[in-house]
A protein has these predicted regions:
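Eukaryote-biased RCC1-like beta-propeller repeat architecture
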Residues: 1-358
Length: 358
């Protein structure tokens, strides 16, 4: 279900009303088609209103560049799940794929049940797991826990509360790992440490040239990160934005996705020097599968890594350090979403899309 892969959190409201309808386009029913190329006749070539959500006022859509499922948050405080559910990542049982969005029950689908005065405020989706964050700072997780990505020792369905020392305000999920941001601006990670994505570089030598990465089964603080506002996860890298507009990145540097100008991966967070000057601080950062995107305070979109099949920004011409996207140089960019192969942004009151078959 490649069409829903993309982080769609935007600092702006979806409209002046503060809500909108869920639109979907591209390939659907990935459980049947797998990841094979499908014919154009099997894809939605234009945005369509998702029928099962047509009567719901939605304020936020949660998905990612590695997920084949999504969570829709309504203005009434309800959470709807949709898409692949083979590992229980939607928090409900009995179906490997949810063709119709399902509203999560506050008592049946959460353990312990959500408090009467609490609602789901935000969340994140990984490849086979989901995190939901409540307005009171609690974190609930569901799905696969093979590498510890849910912060517990068992696969969870329904959503089960994760033990956290502090209240959480933001979350992000990679393929087999998760990050959460607390009210104090600290970042905690859990899951697989492969490629240094948990910011501590933990690994074990099992031979002269073979490494085995450890797993973190409970939330562990990433000490170098302080005063953090938001985090974002790609396939095997991550980025953090602090309250002053500085950007920190870590993980694998393959295909230049970190934008640090080097092919060396980073096991601990490093600050991007291009955004140190006050005039070039960042307002939002989003990780794609093999790229990183930053919206500067001046509303310019900067990119690093690989996001095209060929040409500038392709595998043979990866962008080594962050640079403005020239196609949008004349527009004010407000937010950006990065999927597996496609990208969208809101610029000058228009939605722009690019990428594979965009």
């Amino acid at each position: 279900m490649g069409n829903i892969r993309g982080t769609t959190r935007c600092p702006l409201t979806m409209s002046r009303r503060g809500w909108g309808r869920v639109l979907v386009c591209g390939r659907v029913a990935a459980d049947e088609a797998g990841h094979d190329i499908v014919g154009a006749g099997e894809c939605l070539a234009a945005p369509h209103v998702l029928r099962s959500m047509c009567h719901i006022r939605v304020r936020e859509v949660l998905t990612s560049c590695v997920a084949d499922h999504a969570v829709f948050l309504s203005v009434e405080g309800d959470a709807y799940v949709y898409g692949r559910n083979r590992e229980g990542q939607c928090g409900v049982s009995g179906s490997g794929w949810l063709y119709h969005a399902r509203c999560l029950d506050r008592e049946r689908d959460f353990e312990p049940p959500l408090a009467a005065d609490d609602v789901i405020a935000t969340g994140a989706t990984g490849a086979t797991h989901t995190l939901l964050v409540t307005a009171q700072g609690a974190v609930y997780a569901a799905g696969s826990h093979e590498h510890g990505e849910c912060g517990m020792h068992t696969r969870e369905t329904p959503f089960k509360r994760v033990d956290m020392p502090f209240g959480v305000v933001h979350a992000a999920c990679g393929r087999a790992w998760s990050l959460v941001v607390t009210r104090e601006g600290h970042v905690y990670g859990m899951g697989s440490c492969e490629s240094g994505v948990l910011g501590d570089g933990m690994y074990r030598h099992t031979g002269p040239s073979r490494l085995v990465y450890d797993c973190v089964w409970q939330p562990m603080r990433i000490a170098p990160l302080v005063n953090i506002a938001r985090v974002s996860c790609g396939e095997s890298h991550a980025a953090a934005l602090d309250h002053e507009g500085y950007v920190e990145v870590w993980g694998t540097a393959r295909l230049a996705r970190l934008g640090g100008g080097t092919a060396r991966g980073q096991g601990s967070p490093v600050r991007i020097p291009q955004f140190v000057r006050k005039q070039q601080r960042v307002r939002s950062v989003v990780c794609g599968r093999t790229s990183t995107w930053c919206v500067a305070q001046a509303h310019r979109l900067w990119a690093a890594g690989t996001w095209r099949a060929e040409g500038d920004g392709g595998p043979n011409q990866s962008v080594q350090i962050y640079r403005p996207l020239q196609e949008l140089a004349d527009y004010d960019v407000h937010c950006v979403a990065a999927g597996a192969d496609t990208f969208q942004c809101l610029a000058s009151s228009r939605v722009w899309s690019w990428g594979e078959a965009a």
